[in-house]
Amino acid sequence: MVFFPHRHLIGIKGLTEQDITYLLDKADEAVKISRRREKKTSTLRGLTQINLFFEASTRTQASFELAGKRLGADVMNMSVGNSSVKKGETLIDTAMTLNAMRPDVLVIRHSSAGAAALLAQKVSCSVVNAGDGQHEHPTQALLDALTIRRAKGKLSRIIVAICGDVLHSRVARSNILLLNAMGARVRVVAPATLLPAGIAEMGVEVFHSMKEGLKDADVVMMLRLQRERMSGAFVPSVREYYHFYGLDAETLKAAKDDALVMHPGPMNRGVEIASEVADGPQSVIAEQVEMGVAVRMAVMETLLVSQNQGPRTDGMMA
């Protein structure tokens, strides 16, 4: 029997191919649960999940909440806007307060890289990173991988082109780590101003042309232009950005005929992707949302139930 030896899910970094496969297989089981009429189980009955979102996120928070509830957990969404954090309380103070309530898992999203890892050091329960600054977003990478694997039957040796604002994207970082671990070929396509220094050292091919970067790609993953994280002139204008790096039907022709079109959401239609593509037959964007609930169910069950069936370490995946 394969055991999952980790207490927290802080990032994809530190996960083995076996760990990732285990979670994806678990998520496949969760998809079946989510598609049946009676969706609620008693797997996590009596356990408490607290969602602590310091950054606004409708879809991710709703996905985590639904995942916990479908497993039978008691789920509490902490509204940071009305909390002591707004009154000057530090993350550590918040962690100590929540830990005293004895939850079983804390789900955190924070604008600062490393926030989830810091929280994990201060609490006695499991911690799941729902996105920390520009660092990582592990469950997004897992749901993307599940979407690809279910459509293509594998992850190894497929060509994935990640296009757009790579510099500010924690989604890109987590996907690169996961896809490389699973044997995929990863490309990044972006203007030089939207690529982090040393990106090639992460084991990706770098392109500055959409036509060249998408050639023979099995998957085209578009990233949102994150204007709220920008403090400088990274692109001349939105119009020019779309002209060179937006995905429309004509640009998509460079990829394979059966290439998948993906986007982590929320989309900027007419900025990084055209509606004709986002809503077209090659789009699996809706499937990504569905797989998100399944992946988060798998993560919760694994951290809180499955890991107790075998040996584990208290070390973080960070």
UniProtKB/Swiss-Prot annotation:
Reactions the enzyme catalyzes? carbamoyl phosphate + L-aspartate = N-carbamoyl-L-aspartate + phosphate + H(+)
- Top EC class for this record: transferase
Task: Show the PROSITE patterns listed in the entry.
Answer: CARBAMOYLTRANSFERASE (PS00097)
Taxonomic superkingdom = Bacteria
| EC identifiers of the protein | 2.1.3.2
Q: Does the keyword Transferase apply?
A: yes
- Residues that hold L-aspartate according to the record: K87, R170, R224
Q: Specify which residues bind carbamoyl phosphate according to the UniProt entry for this protein.
A: R59, T60, R109, H137, Q140, G265, P266
Task: List the record's Gene Ontology CC terms alphabetically.
Answer: cytosol
Query: Which keywords, in A-to-Z order, does the entry hold?
Result: Pyrimidine biosynthesis, Transferase
Q: Which GO terms describe its molecular function?
A: amino acid binding; aspartate carbamoyltransferase activity
Its UniProt pathway annotation is:
Pyrimidine metabolism; UMP biosynthesis via de novo pathway; (S)-dihydroorotate from bicarbonate: step 2/3
- Entries under InterPro entries matching the protein: Asp/Orn_carbamoyltranf_P-bd, Asp/Orn_carbamoylTrfase, Asp/Orn_carbamoylTrfase_sf, Asp_carbamoyltransf, Asp_carbamoyltransf_Asp/Orn-bd
Output the GO biological process annotations, alphabetical, semicolon-separated.
'de novo' pyrimidine nucleobase biosynthetic process; 'de novo' UMP biosynthetic process; amino acid metabolic process
HAMAP family referenced in this protein's UniProt entry, alphabetically: Asp_carb_tr
- Subunit structure comment from the entry: Heterododecamer (2C3:3R2) of six catalytic PyrB chains organized as two trimers (C3), and six regulatory PyrI chains organized as three dimers (R2).
According to its UniProt entry, what is the function of this protein?
Catalyzes the condensation of carbamoyl phosphate and aspartate to form carbamoyl aspartate and inorganic phosphate, the committed step in the de novo pyrimidine nucleotide biosynthesis pathway.
Q: Report the family membership.
A: Belongs to the aspartate/ornithine carbamoyltransferase superfamily. ATCase family.
Protein's recorded name: Aspartate carbamoyltransferase catalytic subunit
What is the species of this protein? Rhizobium etli (strain ATCC 51251 / DSM 11541 / JCM 21823 / NBRC 15573 / CFN 42)
